[in-house]
Amino acid sequence: MAKMAKTFVVTLKRSTIKCTQDQKDAVRVLGLKKIRQTVEVKDSAAARGNIMKVQHLIDVEVKG
């Protein structure tokens, strides 16, 4: 049986109003637009980097 790819379940919990443009871009790249919106993101180096940039704004759970 093939190994399942790991994904992250990411939820935006805080607003990006007072954030830098770089942080706003990272949230948008993760696919988040509204507070309390949840998305699944495939595990990659780019995704991990964006998650680290905005870790104070989001909740992250590992799935798979």
Curated annotation (Swiss-Prot):
Keywords: Ribonucleoprotein, Ribosomal protein. Gene3D superfamilies: Ribosomal protein L30, ferredoxin-like fold domain. The keyword Ribosomal protein applies. GO terms for molecular function: structural constituent of ribosome. PROSITE patterns: RIBOSOMAL_L30 (PS00634). The keyword Ribosomal protein applies. It comes from the Bacteria. InterPro entries: Ribo_uL30_ferredoxin-like_sf, Ribosomal_uL30_bac-type, Ribosomal_uL30_CS, Ribosomal_uL30_ferredoxin-like. GO terms for biological process: translation. Part of the 50S ribosomal subunit. Belongs to the universal ribosomal protein uL30 family. HAMAP family: Ribosomal_uL30_B (MF_01371_B). This is Large ribosomal subunit protein uL30. The gene is rpmD.
